[in-house]
Every structure is written in structure tokens, then in C-alpha cells.
Amino acid sequence: MEQRQLSEMIIVAIDGTTVFGGSYYADSPTIGNFERYVTEEVVSLTDSLFRTVPEKGSRALTGFSMGGHGALKLVMKYAGIYAQVGSLSGSPLSMRYRKSIYRKALAGHAIPGSVKDLTGNIRYEENWSLAAAYAKAAAFSLNPGKPPLFLDLPFGNSRDDERDPVWQKWLDDDPLSLVSSHKEALGGMDQIYLDHGEDETTLGTEDFIRELIRYDIGFTHFVFRGDHVDELFLRHARMLRYFSVFWTGGK
């Protein structure tokens, strides 16, 4: 902003982590109502405290990794709040694309006897696929009547994943699965910005983009050299510049 490469804007950073690792910006009585927190509380509080332009056309929702997943999901479900959305290496954008990863991670796995055992023994940096599976279960297939973890895991009894009620709950919050029923919301966005690294292969970004093309929904897609966490500062700056040019009419 000091170099006048960006227009004036207020950036609100949201912490979406939980004891399980990530909330995936879902509403859950066990880990918190992150969906409503982002779309209702944060918007209302920001407009009440700061010099905002309190209207849809001046709001963007963006995120990196899990945040990119959440941003795309929430702008579809809450179409009247945001006009721009940005997803930097949104993870995952297609739950089906990662199904085999989650299934393999959970196969033969002994379920921890407590949340402390889970968080102490299953760490993202050591076994991200298993840790991510538990985080998603806490967000998407919570079960308040099933202590001590209060969640259900998919791929347990059904040989047909598409008939597995737990897996179906995961798909209900899957950005790719939501496109067909929320195409009007996406089509009404002023801007959709997506990026991912050329070395990233498990996000489902390409599947999501094909779905946008299928419904003739406009978007901007940038592929950078590197992997998930590379060039984060540059990527955020590039996305913000993209939004800024739109808000200022190209100035």
C-alpha cells in the first residue's frame, strides 16, 4: 500500500485451527461454529469497528490451503456477503480426489482412546494424511453422542463408499460437490482467483476448474513453480493486487 501497488483495504486474519488441527470452516457443536463465525460475527464486527464499505461488492473472502477450501465453500453457501473469492492451494477442493489417501491412512488404524492421545501421537508433520482425516471427521462427521473423540470415521462397514453415510457427510462440505447446486452463486461472483503449485498433485484443483468450465463460470487461475508452501508472500501479494485492480477500476 505504501508503494501504491494496492488500494486501501482492511485485511482481517482468522484463525481456523482446533485441537484436531483444522476446522475446515464448518459448523460443529463439538469444535465450534466456524462457518457462522466467519460469515456472521467477523463481518458484523469488522463493519462496526472499522471504516469499511459495508456491502457485498467491497468484500472478498480468501484463504490458503484449508482456508482456500473454506473460502470457496462459504462464498457458495453465503452468496449475499462476498463478491470476490481467492483460494491459494485450496486443500482439498475435491474430497473424492483424496479418497484413496484417507482410506489408506485409516485402514487398520487403532482409534486413539482420547483426544490427548490423538493429538499427541498423530502429528501433521509426521502423518498428515491421518491427522487430516481426523480433523475432517471432527468437522464433517461429528458425533456428540460418541465419546471420547465425538466423531465418526468413513470407510468402516460399507463396501460402497457412495452409500457410506459418513463419507456422504464429508461430500456435503466438499467444494467440488457443491458447485452444481451453487453455480448461480459462483457465477454471480465478481472475481474467482485460484492458484496452485505445479508440484502439487493431491488438491483436486484441476477437477474444480473443470467444473467451473462446465458451468461457464469465469475465473483466474495461476500456476506457480513449486509446492504447497512456496512463495506464500508473493502469492498473497499477487492475489491482493488482482482484487485491488478490480476495486479501483484498473488504476
Where are these regions (language model features)?
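Non-catalytic cap/lid and distal C-terminal segments of serine-dependent acyl enzymes
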Residues: M1-K251
